[in-house]
Amino acid sequence: MGKEDKTHINVVVIGHVDSGKSTTTGHLIYKCGGIDKRTIEKFEKEAAELGKGSFKYAWVLDKLKAERERGITIDIALWKFETPKYYVTVIDAPGHRDFIKNMITGTSQADCAILIIAAGTGEFEAGISKDGQTREHALLAYTLGVKQLIVAINKMDTTQWSQTRFEEIIKETKNFIKKVGYNPAGVAFVPISGFNGDNMLEPSTNCPWYKGWEKETKAGKATGKTLLEAIDAIEPPKRPTDKPLRLPLQDVYKIGGIGTVPVGRIETGVLKPGMVVTFAPSNVTTEVKSVEMHHEQLAQGVPGDNVGFNVKNVSVKDIRRGNVAGDSKNDPPAGAASFTAQVIVLNHPGQVGAGYAPVLDCHTAHIACKFAELLEKIDRRTGKAVEASPKFIKSGDAAIVKMIPSKPMCVEAFTDYPPLGRFAVRDMRQTVAVGVIKAVDKSTAAAGKVTKSAAKAAKK
């Protein structure tokens, strides 16, 4: 396979804080990834000097995390690794304060979650206990539309590669993920040691009893032995090129001699020079003169591309971060007067009732929204109503809520445009709830500004 032919996929790694996520992820990146030998040697030397030699894979990841948290934008290639079939990007590993927010507003939707579970006595039980973080992360992944899952049973060396322990854990984990919403038949369960490397890239000789994993896919049965093969067996995502254009703006630049250049990531549809786009909720329509990525002109931009595009006769004052660009002739975006959403309260110290007005982070928009009405309390797993018009909801509850943005904002139903249909509720400097938008009441805005070039282009 040529280098260019590989599909890009995104994975998110979840699991309890001591499950060995960093070591396992570090190992994959280390062995098949974008870290050059020089950097590895430097890290190894530092780790040895600090007496952390045994910790080298996690150390690699810790170095990357520390640099990222200090705001040094390290080369993102460091979070990538290759399998025979895919280029894999690790979006984020939890434990990071903003993990939940990143997962929701994150630049990318994960195609698959890798759940790492520690096999050690007591460790496994702690990881999936009632209040376990693991449960929260798995539920979040499922709620946010990450429908594929791989389970890696880590630290098998601490159980002397016990087959009974492995089978006991699988039985429990199957029940656990079923409660979350996943179908265990479609999940690969792999016994590994992220630290020693067993069953990571090569089949281990330590578990002769292990015959390999198998899972059902749309195409039939898939089998394999290693974690790498399980990642390779992820079903390739369908990128939404056929949907109408949605491009949330990250920034708008004014570039001398060129003019106004909005920048953002195409979430759905395609963007081509000559197209007439509408920005919502600003309600400005204009023609796209050129599209570029990494300083190269593109004939068209597709979902996943971070592009800059030059628009005619629009000032930097007209459009801003959080606006969404779409095709003026194909379901153009519009501001939302109100919307209903399924909201899950994660950690709020008190009760949440009508009138609560926290800030919502949805795609690139960051806007206060009022919980206007709690319509019904629902069972998180089934989505069925358990109480009509509750007075309050608290941590752990899920409800259907009618929300009203404090100023115009552009959102969409999750089923139509997933990245514009999920949000994080931020309050007290943390994510207190997450939501998935069910329906949007689009404000019928008065006719907006249409530039001359757009009017001309429309006549063509």
Swiss-Prot record:
UniProt region (G1), positions on chain: 15-22
Source superkingdom: Eukaryota
PTM sites of type N6,N6,N6-trimethyllysine: 80
Chain residue ranges for the region called G4: 154-157
GO cellular component: cytoplasm
Residues with the N,N,N-trimethylglycine modification: 2
NCBIfam families referenced in this protein's UniProt entry, alphabetically: EF-1_alpha, PRK12317.1
Function: This protein promotes the GTP-dependent binding of aminoacyl-tRNA to the A-site of ribosomes during protein biosynthesis.
Protein name: Elongation factor 1-alpha
